[in-house]
């Protein structure tokens, strides 16, 4: 009996619990002379399987750090960037009544159309643009610059505005105890592509109180001949 137990223990150490459970169960079922040994090893195998199941359950119940700290969902934004030009496109009218939402959408589309005509990005255009039936109006703030400091050129459909201003002021004299010298420098440079319907030769510019205004006339579009056809 002792030799049999020793042999089975050695077998148990060499084989995996699942394989040992199957081999022991098959061998002991065929041995009818020792039912006590069968019950003992069946109990041992069942106990090992129960311990293994408990271990697996404890591992499966372990939560990952992401579950302990769930990811926050981002808030919905009223404006989102949906194209390659960087234009703002409004979302659906879920934040405003239909009338206000439609007005915002229409205003955004008009601004995007103006930027398309001038081939510029809203963030690159440091000024204001107005589109009228007969002209375009541009407005730039150039504080510290005079009309002598500003130079406007058009080359191959590109409008360029440059401004350069330097000033030096001295107060007092070297002989006095207090002598002050101050320098100021201003620089402005921007370029944009003119629309196809712009009249380059008729562009006018005016600088007043640090504000530069440009008026770009537009060519008249031919009127479309619309003919109504009666339905019989």
Curated annotation (Swiss-Prot):
It comes from the Eukaryota. Residues 114-232 form the sHSP domain. Residues 49-64 have a biased composition (Basic and acidic residues). InterPro entries: A-crystallin/Hsp20_dom (IPR002068), HSP20-like_chaperone (IPR008978), HSP21-like (IPR044587). Residues 44-82 are annotated as: Disordered. CDD domains: ACD_sHsps-like. Residues 69-78 have a biased composition (Basic residues). Residues 1-42 form a transit peptide. It is found in: Mitochondrion. Keywords: Mitochondrion, Stress response, Transit peptide. GO terms for cellular component: mitochondrion. One of its GO terms (biological process) is response to heat. May form oligomeric structures. PANTHER family: 26.5 KDA HEAT SHOCK PROTEIN, MITOCHONDRIAL (PTHR46733:SF3). Belongs to the small heat shock protein (HSP20) family. This is 26.5 kDa heat shock protein, mitochondrial. It comes from Arabidopsis thaliana. The lineage of its organism: Eukaryota, Viridiplantae, Streptophyta, Embryophyta, Tracheophyta. The gene is HSP26.5.
